[in-house]
Structure formats: structure tokens, C-alpha cells
Amino acid sequence: MIIKPKVRGFICTNAHPEGCAANVREQIDFVKSQGEIADGPKKVLVIGASTGYGLASRITAAFGCGAATLGVFFEKPGTERKTGSAGFYNSVGFHAEAEKAGLYAKSINGDAFSDEIKAKAIDVIKRDLGKVDLVVYSLASPRRTDPKTGELYSSVLKPIGQSYTAKNLNTDTLKIADMTIEAANEEEIANTVKVMGGEDWELWVEALKEADVLAENAKTVAYTYIGDKLTWPIYGKATIGRAKEDLDRAATAINQKLADLGGSANVAVLKALVTQSSSAIPIMPLYISILYKVMKEEGTHEGCIEQLYRLFTEGVYTDTPRLDDANRFRMDEKELAAELQAKVEAIWPNVTEENLFEETDYKGYNAEFLKLFGFGVDGIDYEKDVAPDVALDLE
């Protein structure tokens, strides 16, 4: 099959197996080039391990620390006629490289919100690893079924308190127009917290602790984004922000649960990046396009893997972590530098459809977006026939 990108709205509906594998190799090469991380984890569970920050966490743990990794994700394998999801192909690529390097890598494909998948992960840890010393929680999902009640909850991306109107870039048509998003009602806020908040992170840690598969001094991290003035109305001071605040509540609760093990739980605040999740959030594509332009000009731009390597070396595995007063690791300090934000804010009102490619790095944004799905990757022949049904040995 010749595989070319099929983009609809903010999602690419197909993926390229070889492009995704090359993407993973590129991230692995970066980690190897940085050198080994001192006193890093040795046995790691990554919940949401197949794309974005979760995948970068798995790569950093394995190739920066020599860790055995168990990944949990919900991805679609390819068939003879249809490509699988990018996350599936990323995981195939990761497994291949881990095997070459003699590193333990196992994966579970299923709904991480369910009790069944938690039990399966615990069984694999008991069988193969004994105990894990790091648990990364990096799930991004629009829906969640509560395992206790069976009720399905859906999240919304809406402001809180009042509707919000702002400039928005339609990445399909490249049209720029004001977009008004109505304020969320109380039920929508509560449902978004239920899906994207810290409850499931807590349930995972509780299940792992109860099963006695957490090592002494085990650490756990969950990821968030805070942003600044331009993104606050749709992010920080919105339904997604309320859900992310719930992560702080969960971190405090988990810390208490891990106290007798000498363990710790922290939220890590990361920078804005092109991911499958961020591309779905109104305003973010335009904001990220401007941010990329300014950060690249200043030489401070980082991708997922650079952020994660730094989180390990400057946050989780150092005696002097960059923590804020809410006990969160801060890896967004370059994005939030006052001078840099001032430049972004100055560009924002001047962007038009005519000057989009001069005033912003939309070209870079779009290239990164396609790369998430394995397209536009250097060294890949996209005219070549490739088999979409790639096998992955799953638990």
C-alpha cells in the first residue's frame, strides 16, 4: 500500500509505519546523544505510552536510564487494507529498538481507565519485574467510563464563567477568524474533571500499592500545561484547566498514600507542543505556531523528547529539582519567560491569512503535526509500497 496523509480537521486519519518507526529512532538517538541519566529509574510503568509526552517518557527511561518498561495504551493495529494508528506504529518501533538494545519492553493494549487493564498490568509487573520504581501517567482521552459505575463521561473544551471570543486558525482551510466558545455548565465542568482530572491516576497508584508492586522510594508523575495570558481563557481558566487542577489535588493525596514507602507524586508542567491532543484545542494551533517562531529564533525551542530528558535530569532525578510552590516540576520556564511571551503577544493581533507564513512558524507546526503520524520524515520513501499490518507482540 502507498500511504499518503489523509487529514480531516485537526486529525490525520491514517499513519505511516516506517515514518513512525523513524520518528521513534530519532528520539532515541537524541537521548543517547545526551548521555546516561544518573540514578534514574530501572523498572518503569508508563500509562499512555504510545504518543507525545508518554512515548518520550518511555524512550527517556529506556534509553537514558537502561530501564525495563511496561507501556499501556489504547491503539488500533493495521489491517491489510487500513493503516493502524500512529501510536501503534510508534510502539512497534519502540519494541524493535528496545529488543536490539537488549532492553525489556512489554506493552498492553486496552482501556487504561478500566479495572481489567490495571489488573493485567499488575500481573505483568509481578511476573516479570517484581516492583516498579517509576509510574508515568500520561493519558489524554476525550471520554472515560467509570470502572465502578459503568457510566460514560465526556470532556469538553470550554471556558468557565463566560463565553470567550478569540482569533482562531482553521488548520484545514488556513482561514483565520474570530471564534466564540460558549461557557461550560456545571455538569460539563464536572464531567471534564472526571475524564481528565486526577481520579484515574489515584486509582492506578492505589491498585499498584495494594498489589505490593511499588518499590521503596517509588516516584509517580502526571503531566499538565498551564500556559500564559493568550491561552488562559481556553486552557488554564477553562474546563481543561479545572481538570488539571484536580491533578494537583490527586498528587497531594497520592503523596500521602506513598509516604510509608518513601515515595513521591508530582505534577510536571510541560511546554506547549504539537501533539495529537493540543491540535484539537481551539486557539492552540495559532499560539503554538507563533511560539515556535519566537522560540526557534531565540534558540530555546524544544520538542517532546528534549522536554522529557530535561524533566528527568532537572526534575525527577536530581537533588535540586525545579519545583514551584505547588510542588510541581516546571519545565515550561523557557516558554513563560516574560520577554518571550511579550513577543508572542505582540505578534498575535497582527497575524492574518496573508502573512501567516511570515509572522508565524505555521510551516513548522504543520510539519510537526504530519510527523506525529509518520509523514514528512527524512529518509522515508513515501512512494514505496508498505504493509500496514505490522505485528506487535502484546501482553
Curated annotation (Swiss-Prot):
Substrate binds at residue 225. Keywords: Fatty acid biosynthesis, Fatty acid metabolism, Lipid biosynthesis, Lipid metabolism, NAD, Oxidoreductase. The keyword Lipid biosynthesis applies. GO terms for biological process: fatty acid biosynthetic process. NAD(+) binds at residues 48-53, 74-75, 111-112, 139-140, 244, 273-275. The active site is at residue 235. It catalyses: a 2,3-saturated acyl-[ACP] + NAD(+) = a (2E)-enoyl-[ACP] + NADH + H(+). Pathway: Lipid metabolism; fatty acid biosynthesis. It comes from the Bacteria. GO terms for molecular function: enoyl-[acyl-carrier-protein] reductase (NADH) activity; NAD binding; trans-2-enoyl-CoA reductase (NADH) activity. Gene3D superfamilies: NAD(P)-binding Rossmann-like Domain (3.40.50.720). The record marks 75 as: Plays an important role in discriminating NADH against NADPH. Its EC number is 1.3.1.9. InterPro entries: Eno_Rdtase_FAD-bd_dom, Enoyl-CoA_Rdtase_cat_dom, FabV-like_NADH_b, Trans-2-enoyl-CoA_reductase. HAMAP family: FabV_reductase (MF_01838). Involved in the final reduction of the elongation cycle of fatty acid synthesis (FAS II). Catalyzes the reduction of a carbon-carbon double bond in an enoyl moiety that is covalently linked to an acyl carrier protein (ACP). Belongs to the TER reductase family. This is Enoyl-[acyl-carrier-protein] reductase [NADH]. It comes from Saccharophagus degradans (strain 2-40 / ATCC 43961 / DSM 17024).
